[in-house]
Amino acid sequence: MIAIGTTLEEKVFFLDRALLKAYADASGDQNPIHQNEEFALSVGLPNVIAHGMLTMALVGKYVSDWAGGAAGVKEFSARFVKPVIVPADQRVDVTVSGVVSAVVDDRITIQLSATSAGVVVLEKSEAVVIK
């Protein structure tokens, strides 16, 4: 039974520079802050950062997997608060979790959280699913 307060199982995704390159190629977003460490540092970032929409896509996958497919996801929103930092030659985690905050008929509202290296990267994130 799904009820208010139900905690969804946490999922950890891993990102590295190769994934950022593949995402940049697929999305057409070749902004050098996502691939060039020297450039990222020159504009005040701590290192190369993941594409925000890649981070949001991982959270979306988490929700759609839980909902039994993308068709069950009726609403999805998030607020970016910190970038996911991806140093060279390292895999970094994006850990996603959720808690049911409302159940009305067949509509379930989930409050979502995403962290990387223990730092909150998305907040005020919410999904509404039909299950």
Residue ranges and their predicted role:
Residues 1-50:
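Catalytic strand-loop segment that frames the active site of acyl-thioester-processing enzymes
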Residues 1-8, 88-131:
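HotDog/MaoC-like acyl-thioester-processing domains
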Residues 10, 73-75, 124:
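Hydrophobic residues on conserved beta-strands that form the core of alpha/beta folds
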Residues 12-14, 79, 128-130:
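Generic structural detector for well-ordered beta-strands
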Residues 17-18, 40, 56, 64, ...:
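Generic secondary-structure boundary signal with a strong preference for alpha-helix termini
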Residues 43-46, 56-95:
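Hydrophobic beta-strand-centered segment that forms part of the acyl-chain substrate-binding groove
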